[in-house]
């Protein structure tokens, strides 16, 4: 092998995500989130201690739960309209609208420009879990 091939192989080893490591990361994330919510087979998110979470944590937890529910095929889409988020959390839509825009500015939540639905940025999943599980 020449130097270029060795360099390419080294870069590949550093950047190529191994399924086992990704799965292990997701297992650790699931362990942390299991103290906050559970997911019914219908895809509904059931909070363990709803009153201990602020609105940002509730929205992030709900959207993260929907991410996993969609990943496992329990629901068709992880994306939610703000009215559906407000209904699921029993909070005023206007209150949550301001908060979700703030989460978007932090890069934790994205909004689909075609239909206005919100979803978590899965590349920030570790940051999102840290935000959800931080002590108030």
Q: Language-model segments: what does each one mean?
A:
Residues 1-51:
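Long, low-complexity, charged/polar intrinsically disordered regions in eukaryotic proteins
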Residues 104-114:
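A short, conserved structural fragment
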Residues 58-78:
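Short helix->loop/beta-hairpin flanking segments within DNA-binding domains
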Residues 77-87:
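A short alpha-helical element within helix-turn-helix/winged-helix DNA-binding domains
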